[in-house]
């Protein structure tokens, strides 16, 4: 009996030790890559948060990208207010939460930036703001960005990351497709350069409007780029589609983008393109 009690006590002590050790291990040390499914130690993602196995770029906040890409940045005033025209339930609360998470008023950060003294208008979408969806305020900020660039004679660089039009605003969000496209057209008519960089994900109404209307379209490795999502396509076609159909590499092969650029090279490539087209988009 004493031997049994001793063994039981040892077992309890071992269980308690394991529970305490488990509690001391912080969350988030290991992350699963959404593309290759490999488990990665978080420090191995590095400064640019890139999978060391497949080079997939993890979704990143707009203000973090800003540090990667530019030497200076002057933000545009956040004058565009996000409406709730359909009185969608809990939409204001969802907006406030997204604003707290990202530090942005809406899903895009806009302003005027420089890379090695090359000045340009910059917009960076944030996938952590309601999946980077495009609402009325987003469309207004993008439109104002292009109008400013047209007025000042500046090129535009826009980093797209969006699930598409924001469902909480219904037809008002879809109207932003035409609105932003008109602003892009006016900018192009002045012979000014527009570069877009498509990141994961770039889908829906954003893909069908300003994101793919650029003079030069770049993308990140393994980024999902398309209009409808995989599930919608498969339900419509009643068949499975290739796993890589909407990957940037397939989109490049099919001629819809111009180049895939890794995160560590983006600042250099963008500077080279700005320098090359100092006289305008057609030089």
Swiss-Prot record:
Which PANTHER family does its entry note? Answer: ACETYL-COENZYME A CARBOXYLASE CARBOXYL TRANSFERASE SUBUNIT BETA, CHLOROPLASTIC (PTHR42995:SF5)
User: Its Gene Ontology biological processes?
Assistant: fatty acid biosynthetic process; malonyl-CoA biosynthetic process
- Its Enzyme Commission number? 2.1.3.15
Protein name per Swiss-Prot or TrEMBL? Acetyl-coenzyme A carboxylase carboxyl transferase subunit beta
Specify which residues bind Zn(2+) according to the UniProt entry for this protein.
33, 36, 51, 54
Molecular function terms from GO: acetyl-CoA carboxylase activity; ATP binding; carboxyl- or carbamoyltransferase activity; zinc ion binding
A GO cellular component annotated for this chain's UniProt record is:
acetyl-CoA carboxylase complex
Cite the CoA carboxyltransferase N-terminal domain residue spans from the record. 29-283
Identify which cofactors the protein needs according to its UniProt entry.
Zn(2+)
Summarize subunit and interaction data from the UniProt record for this chain: Acetyl-CoA carboxylase is a heterohexamer composed of biotin carboxyl carrier protein (AccB), biotin carboxylase (AccC) and two subunits each of ACCase subunit alpha (AccA) and ACCase subunit beta (AccD).
What functional role does this protein have?
A: Component of the acetyl coenzyme A carboxylase (ACC) complex. Biotin carboxylase (BC) catalyzes the carboxylation of biotin on its carrier protein (BCCP) and then the CO(2) group is transferred by the transcarboxylase to acetyl-CoA to form malonyl-CoA.
Report the co-factor binding details.
Answer: Binds 1 zinc ion per subunit.
Q: What is its main location?
A: cytoplasm
Q: What class of enzyme is it?
A: transferase
Which segments does the record annotate as C4-type zinc fingers?
33-54
Q: Does Nucleotide-binding appear among the keywords?
A: yes
Tell me the keywords, alphabetical order: ATP-binding, Cytoplasm, Fatty acid biosynthesis, Fatty acid metabolism, Lipid biosynthesis, Lipid metabolism, Metal-binding, Nucleotide-binding, Transferase, Zinc, Zinc-finger
Q: Which reaction does it catalyse?
A: N(6)-carboxybiotinyl-L-lysyl-[protein] + acetyl-CoA = N(6)-biotinyl-L-lysyl-[protein] + malonyl-CoA
Q: Which cell locations does it reside in? A: Cytoplasm
Write out the similarity annotation.
Belongs to the AccD/PCCB family.
Pathway note: Lipid metabolism; malonyl-CoA biosynthesis; malonyl-CoA from acetyl-CoA: step 1/1
The organism named in the record is: Latilactobacillus sakei subsp. sakei (strain 23K) (Lactobacillus sakei subsp. sakei)
